[in-house]
Amino acid sequence: MASRIGRPPGTCGGITASSSPLPRSRTGWKRGEKRAEERITRDYLDAALADFSGYIAADELYDGPYCVLSIVDNRRFKRLLYEVLDHNPTEEDILRFFRRFQDALAARGLTLRGVTTDGSPMYPQAIVEVFGPVEHQLCQFHILAELTKAVIKAVAQVRRQLKGTLPRFGRGRPSRANRRLAARKKHTEQKIVDLFEHRHLFVQHHLTAAQQKTLRRITRGLPALRTLRQIMDEVYRLFDRRCRTDTALAKLARLRRRVSRFKGLRQTLGKLFSPNLEKALTFLDDSLLPATSNAVERGNRRHRKMQKTVYRVRTGPHISQRIAADMLRDAQAEGRFQTTLTLHLARAG
């Protein structure tokens, strides 16, 4: 047990020294973070770019007052470069970040063939200015997420319209004259419940025979909702890898003309007329260009999990060191697997 050896100042009774001090707390502490950051700036890129695919994914991650810019090999799933900012990124920050990566490629004689990003307006001009006329693909998942959100919102609007048509009665059992209206009210209420419980069927990509039967049942008497489902089927067909970009753009033009004939749908599906949808079809002409930015999003999700399970108070240097440690861990993953496999084989005899 620790014993006091210093005279307490004043009347507060504070301990100024101890004959047996306890070790420092290691909560939220991880070895090697500072050294990891130094190694990332020295020799990590040489190994990471040794099998560079030529395709990258770029994205930004917001962590409180900080923002993390990341570039990941979109086919090898390796984080290549990152930068921690203490403010929201601007076009100048994106330009400087991309120039750092372009200098690293030029120093090793490598060329970039394609970039995948989200729909942020900060990327297009910076990509053209730094990398030249490379293929720029917008993430397919971001585009589909906006469209599915609009369709779900349209289904909710139909539910509200049905709720407004419900007849109102006084308390108690309906009279003989209102029995038919009461039965219709009960049927409409059940349809509203079904539309809510099965709303995912309007945006799900593939439907089973049972799900198709359910969809036909809950949309009986609601042709607008059946049209919404048909439009979603056409949207999914746009991203079929068997098509070329020109073919998909022709399909998109026909789909837009069809939607324009419905005044209500034209307003609801405004995202269908966004130019970002056309940029999301660039990957159809290049079989190696990934359609999504899942490679960089995966690292962002792991960072979010680390926020919840490892540390709470974050500083800019701490975030940078943690990311560097994770990058080194990924770089050593293959070696750890080979070591584990060798030990298992040796143990098995």
Language-model region placement:
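Short hydrophobic/aromatic segments of transmembrane alpha-helices and their interfaces
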Residues: P8, D46, F283-L284
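Acidic/histidine-rich catalytic cores and adjacent linkers
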Residues: A106, L110, T117-Q125, F131, ...
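Short, solvent-exposed secondary-structure capping/transition elements
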Residues: L80, K153-R160, T208, R336
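Conserved beta-strand -> loop -> alpha-helix junction used to position metal-binding or nucleic-acid-contacting
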Residues: V115-P121, A126-G170
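RNase H-like nuclease fold core
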Residues: R4-I5, G14-P133, K153-A154, A295
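Alpha-helix boundary/capping detector
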Residues: K34, E38, D51, Y55, ...
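Extended interfacial segments that mediate partner engagement and assembly in macromolecular machines
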Residues: M1-I5, P9
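Alpha-helix initiation and N-capping motif
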Residues: I5, L22, Q140-L144, V155, ...
